């Protein structure tokens, strides 16, 4: 499966975050894509990354911010 991976900046008080960078990610499942995306966020050289959003077929299937449980 192909996913659009959006690397997100720090969320504001309302929980909205700007997209810093867009990437494409290939994975067999949403869970595998989420694990890979989390590793990208935690080890990325892109400054200001606080989380990510995974999109498949135009729909958000997962999102995560540093400090959240899961993945």
What is the meaning of each model-derived region?
Residues 28-46:
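A short, charged, amphipathic alpha-helix used as a generic interaction element across diverse proteins
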């Amino acid at each position: 499966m192909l996913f659009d991976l959006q690397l997100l900046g720090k969320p504001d008080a309302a929980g909205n975050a700007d997209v810093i960078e867009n990437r494409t990610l290939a994975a067999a499942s949403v869970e595998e894509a989420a694990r890979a995306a989390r590793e990208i966020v935690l080890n990325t050289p892109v400054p200001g990354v606080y989380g990510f959003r995974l999109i498949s077929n135009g729909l958000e299937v997962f999102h995560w911010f540093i400090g959240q449980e899961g993945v």
